[in-house]
Amino acid sequence: MNETGETPPQQLARNFNELLQELRVALSGVQILFAFLLAVAFTERYEEASAYIRGIHLVTVILVAISFGFLMAPAVWHRMLFRRGHRENILPIANRFALCGIAFLAASMTGTVLLIAEVAVGGVAAKILAACAAIMF
């Protein structure tokens, strides 16, 4: 028993469930951002976009996809290894994957701010806004 009155397996189950709950929140944001970025490619204005804007967009889409993969992996592992007694091995790795997913999410949010700022104001102001977003994340 620990200070919360849980046995080690109970604490492990709670920690894993808390991680999965946190990932559900992050994944909702990733899915919305991914949908927005996918929709952008099918607008009339996208056809007129410069190679620079298209490059920012493509890199940002890739960053969001990587983020999604990292954030989704712990839930998939949990489902695949459910009731096989591997939680103590999976939890540290799942935590690292979650942190990587959040880092890629921060990079993709910065890319999204840069993309929108380049279209809206362009130039140095766009880079400053993206840098502010990067610092914030």
Language-model-detected regions and their locations in the chain:
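Cytosol/matrix-facing amphipathic helices and coiled-coil assembly/linker segments
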Residues: 1-49, 67-75
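Alpha-helical transmembrane segments of integral membrane proteins
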Residues: 48-137
